[in-house]
């Protein structure tokens, strides 16, 4: 028995030695071959190596990427399978063999020479005699990328457009809808939250800007990571961060913690736009890309409509609240914040059913995973179209040469946090290097011009869209002030005031032995008045002040008449007992003004629907650049009419007009950005440009709102000049219509 075992072991060792020698000679012959493509994209025939004219004992296999073109060669080479018993590192079983995945002839782990050097043209290997992997020229890498782009486009056409893309459309639409909701949340809750959190004007301003700052950080962070870790994975993480901190923000009581939660919520949702557009574009064929990316933009509008409708339906219902002592209050506006997290939560659940982008897999040398995803796309669409018998004929997909960038650490090296720290630093270095490559010689001009277009459009758009509601509120305040009633020189004695006084000015009045019980004062001013032996009890006030008044022997019991409401006034022998608890600041709370904010936002977001439809239908017909420049010019012209907006209704109409014509330029800009950068830089560049967009939004909002109530002469020229500059820069960018995705 032992002798038989030894003979068998010796036989196996001998067979392995022979196999190694055969592989060594075959590899030497293959290295001399030419890595070429034979009419790959018109005849769907891909040939990896040319045969030599001399003695060719091992004919090169036909590496065509469709089934049936290399069947004979595969049958001839079937006896030389690597799946042999007792195989070692040089004879590994192909890792996808047991999953039914076609073997990738470039990029496979098992394709090595006997001395350990990779084959020519294989991922990480030599190419056309250029030397070691680190010496591969950028021209060769660009050639590989162009070949992959053409091949990938042909495969997407075979997969078709159908149920899979529409399912992904609605899933990613939820993520984009969550971004649209996030922009409006803080603006809608401020009229109610300012009372609960006792917010000053500076606090409210910071709360309004913190969301944009968070989205700016998130866009750059998640955009860079998505090119290294994957679109789906980073989108799941970013949406999870958004939903978790949006949920927490609805329960926290203090201003600081609420501000922190909204900041991190903005960081989470910041990754939505750059990842969603890049992710969806990599499942769309060239003839469908512009149109369907434009349809996807509609979900941002739907998010704004959803937020406005929920605010209108929830916030005014004060009964939807509860209180635990005087320290914890949960009012209806917190319910609204909670409801606004639903799109993000639903997007997370739906996204778990979707695969990663196959283009990302191919860019990272993961042929097997990419093939399985593309097969899933093909089979899903064919079944939905009633052709389940159609077979996915792709057998080989080209992968890009990969450089060794990751730092591997053995599990027994250092502590776990040291290993994670090194990996995090390595990943951060890769992300930063990828970002800097966007400013390399090949993409520097495009990136700088895109920065100009994104900045100018965002500066004018966000600045004007926030300036519009502020101008409407200013016009409302002017109209309200014009209806103020003035009561000069009145003398009142022994009268009990137990009703509401609103929008009144009392000048030079004298009040003796009067009682103010259960009185509500709203926008009331007492000037140069005398109060002697009066009694104030259970008085609530807003925007009420006593200027240059004198109080003698007067008692204030359970009122909210705090010290700052007495401007240059004298109090002689007057007493304050049991002042009301709560915010000592003067806030307006909810009311007609809050309803107007919801209504204006609802109309403004709904007004972009026609622009969305037109841009989707014409995007692939007239091109991205014409759409972008034309919409920007129309927006610039619409700014001219702002000078004639002197009433509330006129300003609302102009807001709808501006939003309707400017949305097409945003859609075109999103589609253009996706097509200008290659797949390994797409989300990084998109994230950086979107972060710049949020920075411009902060600057635009700060500058434009400072002119509210002063003049319209400054904001309108600013916006018009920015839009004109952006449209002129856009015309100098390359057109991406009719081009395959890089």
UniProtKB/Swiss-Prot annotation:
Modified residues (Phosphotyrosine): 480
GO process terms (BP): chemical synaptic transmission; neurotransmitter transport
Feature: compositional bias, Basic and acidic residues: 33-49
GO CC aspect terms: neuron projection; synaptic vesicle membrane
Keyword field: Cell projection, Cytoplasmic vesicle, Glycoprotein, Membrane, Neurotransmitter transport, Phosphoprotein, Synapse, Transmembrane, Transmembrane helix, Transport
Annotated signal peptide: none
SUPFAM superfamilies in the record: MFS general substrate transporter, Pentapeptide repeat-like
Modified residues (Phosphoserine): 80-81, 127, 393
Biased composition (Gly residues): 122-137
GO molecular function annotation: transmembrane transporter activity
Function of the molecule: Plays a role in the control of regulated secretion in neural and endocrine cells, enhancing selectively low-frequency neurotransmission. Positively regulates vesicle fusion by maintaining the readily releasable pool of secretory vesicles.
Oligomeric form and interacting partners: Interacts with SYT1/synaptotagmin-1 in a calcium-dependent manner. Binds the adapter protein complex AP-2.
UniProt family annotation: Belongs to the major facilitator superfamily.
Protein name listed in UniProt: Synaptic vesicle glycoprotein 2A
Species annotation: Macaca fascicularis
